A protein has these predicted regions:
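Non-catalytic nucleic-acid substrate-recognition regions in nucleic-acid-modifying enzymes
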Residues: 1-35
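Conserved AdoMet
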Residues: 2, 33, 38-116
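Conserved hydrophobic residues forming the short capping helix/wall of the S-adenosyl-L-methionine
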Residues: 24, 118, 167, 239, ...
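Short helix-capping segments at alpha-helix termini
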Residues: 28-29, 145-147, 168-173, 242-243, ...
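Residue-level signal for inorganic ion chemistry
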Residues: 39, 77, 107, 137, ...
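Conserved SAM/SAH cofactor-binding pocket of Class I
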Residues: 105, 109-208
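Mobile active-site "lid"/loop adjacent to the S-adenosyl-L-methionine
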Residues: 200-231
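Conserved Class I SAM-dependent methyltransferase catalytic core
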Residues: 226-289
């Protein structure tokens, strides 16, 4: 297929937007023109609106090279957030890296469920985020609960370090600390609120995911074992010793997992209190309560 020529002269903003959009369209990227615009705005450290105001403005050679390099990575289906190193989550701008799962809008449902379960926004709650990754869940909750403090745990030291950087950049380092560890193995004490977005995809299903996910995001954050429930079994077994009296745990679910995870909770002596659906109508945030 011969791509149509670009109307703007080579080396200009308009040319790079046109050429980038064509390359991304050829790679079956879903919103090629939008992504080309966002990528060039990132490289030039400007707004998308500013790009469109002056499409014949020249792009400096070093930034043109940077754009070409990032474009090639996106054509290879590397996630957009890994190219820019940032993603929006809740009201926060969060740093991401290939060591972490990219926070999704679906996971904001956990924040909503947690805030609903903890209506006193001034309470000095102790919060735990298991498998914290970027720290997005914990930091989003702390940004809304002004007197709360928390701990985030991740198996990967580089993820825990990244989460700590996010806390510092967002002004939350005084109320959040991050540790490398195997789920809750090394933790003691009790928590009023526990958050967790565990790996919950069945092992056999991972190869069939979008290439951005299957090829690039960490398998340890995706693979939930043969039935997708391995992480839930480990986490829920620990919840009774970790939850304070009347404490709540909010767990992210995969599609179709609500009944199985509720059963695991009941078997551990916990009460399924609520399950909040995401914007697509999928039951996504399960709330389990301690006695």
């Amino acid at each position: 297929v011969i791509e149509p020529r670009c109307a703007d002269p080579a080396g200009t903003i308009g040319f790079f937007l046109c050429h980038g959009g064509q390359r991304l369209r050829g790679a079956a990227i879903e919103a090629p023109r939008l992504e080309a615009r966002r990528l060039l705005a990132h490289v030039l450290n400007t707004s998308e609106e500013a790009l469109l105001r002056d499409p014949r403005a020249p792009v400096p050679a070093d930034q043109a090279q940077q754009f070409a390099a990032l474009l090639a990575r996106r054509v290879a289906h590397e996630p957009f957030a890994y190219l820019t190193g940032r993603v929006g989550f809740w009201t926060l701008d969060v740093e991401v890296s290939p060591a972490t799962l990219i926070p999704r809008a679906d996971s904001e449902t956990l924040v909503e469920a947690a805030l609903e379960a903890c209506p006193d926004k001034g309470a000095a709650l102790h919060v735990l985020d298991l498998g914290t990754g970027t720290g997005a869940l914990l930091l989003a909750v702390l940004s809304e609960l002004s007197a709360a403090s928390g701990v985030g745990v991740d198996l990967k030291p580089e993820a825990a370090a990244l989460a700590a950087r996010n806390a510092a950049r967002l002004g939350l380092a005084g109320r959040a600390r991050f540790l490398a560890g195997d789920w809750a193995v090394a933790l003691a004490g009790r928590f009023d609120l526990i958050l967790c977005n565990p790996p919950y995809i069945e092992s056999a299903a991972i190869a069939g995911l979008m290439p951005e996910v299957a090829r690039h995001e960490p398998a340890s954050a995706l693979d939930g074992g043969a039935d997708g429930l391995d992480a839930y079994r480990r986490i829920i077994a620990d919840l009774p010793r970790l939850l304070a009296a009347r404490g709540v745990a909010v767990l992210e679910l995969g599609a179709g997992q609500q009944a199985a995870v509720e059963a695991l909770g009941r078997a551990a002596g916990l009460t399924p209190e609520a399950c909040r659906a995401d914007l697509g109508g999928v039951p996504r945030a399960l709330v389990l309560c301690a006695a």
